[in-house]
């Protein structure tokens, strides 16, 4: 994933700050009501489709991508056409974040199972090797050790 990947800058808090409370809440409602019909991600962009509330209208097509100055988007709804960040774009972004959270949880569960087959010595050697180059990991390991000593 490069520096221009949507995943590097797309977070719930950032999105809420960009769009404002009202639009963010309306996007959450759009997602929770099952109107997001699909979301796909590629490096640097998200694409999705949202069912409109009004019967007979065509689904809204949403695209979110990264520019040098932040997130950019397109939506075929009237609000999106006026270049405002709409609830449909928020719903697509939130659907992506939800999907990513589930994916990571599954990966971590599988990793936990795999780690049970690794010797304690190999795990310790690997952790120490990574802690030598990752200050955050080093501090996390120190915290774990300090708690265990109590």
Model feature map: region roles:
Residues 1-150:
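Long, low-complexity, compositionally biased intrinsically disordered regions
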């Amino acid at each position: 994933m490069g520096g221009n990947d949507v995943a590097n800058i797309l977070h719930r808090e950032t999105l809420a700050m960009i769009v404002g409370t009202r639009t963010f809440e309306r996007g959450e409602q759009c997602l929770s009501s099952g109107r997001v019909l699909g979301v796909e991600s590629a490096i640097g962009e998200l694409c999705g489709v949202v069912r409109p509330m009004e019967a007979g209208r065509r689904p809204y097509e949403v695209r979110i991508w990264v520019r040098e100055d932040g997130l950019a988007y397109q939506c075929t709804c009237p609000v999106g056409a006026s270049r405002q960040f709409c609830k449909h774009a928020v719903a697509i972004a939130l659907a992506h974040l939800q999907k990513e959270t589930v994916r990571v949880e599954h990966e971590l569960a599988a990793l936990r199972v795999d780690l049970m087959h690794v010797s304690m010595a190999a795990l310790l050697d690997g952790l120490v090797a990574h802690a030598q180059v990752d200050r955050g990991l080093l501090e996390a390991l120190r915290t774990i050790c300090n708690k265990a000593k109590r």
